[in-house]
Amino acid sequence: MTGRCILQIALLVCFFTTAHSVSYKLLGFQLRSSSLECQELLVNLNRTSKYCLKDRMNFEVPEEIKKSQRFQKEEAILVINEMFQKIFNIFSRSTSSTGWNETTVENLLATLHWQKEHLETILEEIMEEENFTWDNTTLLNLKKYYLRIVRYLKAKEYSVCAWTVVHAEILRNFFFLERLTDYLQN
């Protein structure tokens, strides 16, 4: 799996380092591939427990994320980047209590890190080439959403059940990420 991931990253770096303008279809394809890789890694981590049902919580995904078709493509890239960044930050925290395979967590973090670095480069390019303005309300709501997740983990002292709940929530995030990347390909 690691070899496949490295080959995929190398090919994508070749595609994007020579590009001077954003190809949204190609970017959408690449993001979908990366998101699927992350989902696969997250599924491999799963050790759900019915005993954790009492710990479930509604973290309240921002409405604007649920309705991604309202974004401009540049805004969608900004939101996707923020989501990858926050997911990376969450899984960079102490996962030792989970019993998860450390290699799988490291592969997840590597994929997320590469993706967010790549998106930041593309966002810089967009900002340079286009007269792009953005309403910060969506990003603020998104940051508050992820802050609720982090506070939940801290309040539950990073317990196995807390991580189980957060794991399920992050998997749900990839549903929204898929919709955003599909939007880029249209």
Curated annotation (Swiss-Prot):
The UniProt record lists the keyword Glycoprotein: yes
Protein name as it appears in the record: Interferon beta
Glycosylated residues, chain numbering: N46, N101, N131, N136
A Pfam family the protein falls into: Interferon
Signal peptide: 1-21
Top-rank taxon: Eukaryota
GO terms (BP aspect): adaptive immune response; B cell activation involved in immune response; defense response to virus; humoral immune response; natural killer cell activation involved in immune response; negative regulation of Lewy body formation; neuron cellular homeostasis; positive regulation of autophagy
UniProt cross-references to SUPFAM superfamilies, sorted A to Z: 4-helical cytokines (SSF47266)
Gene Ontology cellular component annotations, sorted alphabetically: extracellular space
Residues recorded as bearing Phosphotyrosine in the entry: Y24
Family (UniProt): Belongs to the alpha/beta interferon family.
Gene name of the encoded protein: IFNB1
Keywords assigned by UniProt, alphabetized: Antiviral defense, Cytokine, Disulfide bond, Glycoprotein, Phosphoprotein, Secreted, Signal
